[in-house]
Amino acid sequence: MSKQNHFLVINGKNCCVFRDENIAKVLPPVLGLEFVFGLLGNGLALWIFCFHLKSWKSSRIFLFNLAVADFLLIICLPFLTDNYVQNWDWRFGSIPCRVMLFMLAMNRQGSIIFLTVVAVDRYFRVVHPHHFLNKISNRTAAIISCFLWGITIGLTVHLLYTDMMTRNGDANLCSSFSICYTFRWHDAMFLLEFFLPLGIILFCSGRIIWSLRQRQMDRHVKIKRAINFIMVVAIVFVICFLPSVAVRIRIFWLLYKHNVRNCDIYSSVDLAFFTTLSFTYMNSMLDPVVYYFSSPSFPNFFSTCINRCLRRKTLGEPDNNRSTSVELTGDPSTIRSIPGALMTDPSEPGSPPYLASTSR
């Protein structure tokens, strides 16, 4: 290892490394919000999956794996936040550094893969409702999920057996995205995990919208909302991942043109990359919205909870007001009755035709 200004040799590769104080000021609050909301959303989703789903279906199995990937990514954010707060001085040793980088990469990739699978599953159920893929068993869906996890782990496991911590002056650098004069497997996967799923998600979303409009189903208010939701999912995916990918491509172009002879030219793009990289974690924070709209079990669960709260409140009112009502009127029949809708749980499932088709 050698050091000259921002120049650093990492594992035999010439790299440019920066410790920008702006990262320590700006990113920790952003990651903190992503952690809090992501933990609440995905934690609640996993709780519903594990304890409140009456039955499992293939589409729900894919959603469950998406929630697992998002949750595992979210719980790594406090360690990444501490790394930023310490201005790129990792305090927990080499093995925890590898584990954190592996978990971030694996679960970011896993989240993207299962989000893509959910889009493909929805595509077949809406556009090709009689396709044999719509009839796969829960066992087959579980096997597919395990296979996808195996691929994800295989593509990112190199982070576990490679020493990712490097001494940088008086600090320990822990990062998998240093600016180095080489095109690594990690960089290739970072680009591929965006462009390939993006193409699939855009194709599936476009075909779903076109199919619904061909059947003239898009005139229904609930179907319009479903179409809007499909578009929002695609837009959020682009907003979360495109900025960091675009900046990374810019870095590759600068490396091609200038090598690492002058590290100063990379200062601004390095700051831009790690800033936009924090947007990718926002996708895991927003995925609970996908669970809510993709399966009627989630809105039904929340409706049941709200109804139970209202029922308890309404049941308490007659007890509190009963003596007063009798005293004033002399007739207990004047006491208000509880609406029947609050006395019964909502039926399963009460969703619009399009959304219901995604969970059958």
Swiss-Prot record:
Cellular localisation: Cell membrane
Gene Ontology BP annotations: G protein-coupled receptor signaling pathway; negative regulation of lipid catabolic process; neutrophil apoptotic process; positive regulation of adiponectin secretion; positive regulation of neutrophil apoptotic process
Biased composition, class Polar residues, residue ranges: 321-336
Region: Disordered, residue numbers: 320-360
PTM-bearing positions, type Phosphoserine: S325
Topological category with respect to the lipid bilayer: Multi-pass membrane protein
Acyltransferase found in the keyword field: no
Transmembrane segments: 31-51, 61-81, 99-119, 141-161, 190-210, 227-247, 271-291
Gene Ontology MF terms in the entry: GTP binding; nicotinic acid receptor activity; purinergic nucleotide receptor activity
Pfam family, one: 7tm_1
Stretches assigned to the Extracellular side: 1-30, 82-98, 162-189, 248-270
Organs and tissues of expression: Expressed in adipose tissue, lung and spleen.
GO cellular component: plasma membrane
Keywords, alphabetical: Apoptosis, Cell membrane, Disulfide bond, G-protein coupled receptor, Membrane, Phosphoprotein, Receptor, Transducer, Transmembrane, Transmembrane helix
Stretches of the chain found on the membrane's Cytoplasmic side: 52-60, 120-140, 211-226, 292-360
InterPro entries: GPCR_Rhodpsn, GPCR_Rhodpsn_7TM, HCARs
Disulfide bonds: C97-C174
Lineage top rank: taxon: Eukaryota
Main location: membrane
Family: Belongs to the G-protein coupled receptor 1 family.
Task performed by this protein: Acts as a high affinity receptor for both nicotinic acid (also known as niacin) and (D)-beta-hydroxybutyrate and mediates increased adiponectin secretion and decreased lipolysis through G(i)-protein-mediated inhibition of adenylyl cyclase. This pharmacological effect requires nicotinic acid doses that are much higher than those provided by a normal diet. Mediates nicotinic acid-induced apoptosis in mature neutrophils.
Protein name in UniProt: Hydroxycarboxylic acid receptor 2
Protein source organism: Rattus norvegicus (Rat)
